Amino acid sequence: MQKPQTIFEKIWENHMVHEEEGKPSLLYIDQHLVHEVTSPQAFEGLRLNNRKVRRPDLTFATMDHNVPTVNRESFKDEISKKQMDALKKNCEEFGIKLADMYHPDQGIVHVIGPQLGLTQPGKTIVCGDSHTSTHGAFGALAFGIGTSEVEHVLATQTIWQDKPKTLNVKVIGELGIGVTAKDLILAIIAKFGVQFGTGYVMEYTGESIRKMSMEERMTICNMSIEAGARAGLISPDQTTVDYLRGREMVPKGEAYDTLAAEWLQLATDEDAVYDDTVTIHANEIEPQVTWGTNPGMCVPISSSTPSIEKASYPDEVERALEYMGLTENQLMTSIEVDHVFIGSCTNSRLSDLKKAAAIVKGKKVKAGIRAMVVPGSFLVKQKAEEIGLDQVFMDAGFEWRNSGCSMCLGMNDDIVPAGGRCASTSNRNFEGRQGNGARTHLVSPEMAAAAAIEGHFVDVRSYASVPS
């Protein structure tokens, strides 16, 4: 009788090409996602060594990090334009399908992969981007890689990897009304720290996880890297199967049903043993707001910034408070914002936009605040416009943009000015992440929307229109 296995062990075993004890293992890669920032040097390496892309059919490229979200022809700088031109040239030369910024499949790479059905349970997926962990929501082993590894995968369709350990993040109970997947993952990182997942693949289990939609699960797995993990995983179930049915890149009819049955067998076996387990109680979690300069510097909205004297790392806390322009023991509800960004690979999908729109409908953005909504893909934008979400946001005073990474990172036209304070639905609040000197507070789409209306952070649960 075979030993019970976790989903990670099953996928790893299925993709093992070569292993030696004490050395990295060689894994086969099922899907390689490429964007314009981390790929130019990789393609140049292929040219210098006279190599081809081994499996262009298993490689898919898009433009997302640098794309302008207002005027597609207006670039922040020459480097951004050169990177996008290089990707177009490289994809043409090496025979790779590209969704450029005018293509109907264009979008943030971690939004369009699932949207197209490229992301599937049991696959190994890599991309030159740390938030590749997003795809783990489908029961895929997905992780970010560096530029030299991008070249290796392009050339060989394999990658050398040290085998991580397994960590069960067990979520007990259910989330309360107005508390979101974003709040859950922020609370997990705040409780256990930004390094507790180092050396592990984290699998999320429990009642709350099972009740989540696929888009909520993507938010959870997206931020696994912020806990230090190599990847995040959620075992596939009927929710996964229903989401992928009919997607462009999956089989149809009986072939899909056969494949779906195989996917469901990938779920972690009942008696499988993890290397470690942590637990968190969902019903104790409130809407969250980060106060500092990493995602672990996060507290409930009803709380305040920490006391420097009582902090475990007082120097770190003092520096973060100084950079953020905050004082110790300051109520989170007293923090005013001047920018609001709803977007990024964490929270730019249709369900995210629907929830934010429910908060702002019939209201107005506070005077002096610049608020923008940036859909995660061309298709998300199209679907949102079909149901009138664009008009809801624009009537409230939000800017309605084209798809792209946008204000998540200071790499394109959409930046927060020095000293500006942004309520952001993105995943990183490092110093200068949204622009030189910018101050970032990570929140859910609902919390960001409420901050835009009120001008400061509020407990979104006080809004009668909070979706259940």
Curated annotation (Swiss-Prot):
Keywords recorded for this protein, A-Z: 4Fe-4S, Amino-acid biosynthesis, Branched-chain amino acid biosynthesis, Iron, Iron-sulfur, Leucine biosynthesis, Lyase, Metal-binding
Gene Ontology MF: a single term: 3-isopropylmalate dehydratase activity
Entry EC number(s): 4.2.1.33
Reactions accelerated catalytically: (2R,3S)-3-isopropylmalate = (2S)-2-isopropylmalate
Xref: InterPro entries: 3-IsopropMal_deHydase_lsu, Acnase/IPM_dHydase_lsu_aba_1/3, Acoase/IPM_deHydtase_lsu_aba, Aconitase_4Fe-4S_BS, Aconitase_4Fe-4S_dom, IPM_dehydratase_rel_enz, IPMI_cat
Binding positions ([4Fe-4S] cluster): C345, C405, C408
Short name of any one Pfam family annotated for the protein: Aconitase
Family: Belongs to the aconitase/IPM isomerase family. LeuC type 1 subfamily.
Primary role: Catalyzes the isomerization between 2-isopropylmalate and 3-isopropylmalate, via the formation of 2-isopropylmaleate.
Annotated protein name in UniProt: 3-isopropylmalate dehydratase large subunit
Native source species: Oceanobacillus iheyensis (strain DSM 14371 / CIP 107618 / JCM 11309 / KCTC 3954 / HTE831)
Native organism taxonomy: Bacteria, Bacillati, Bacillota, Bacilli, Bacillales
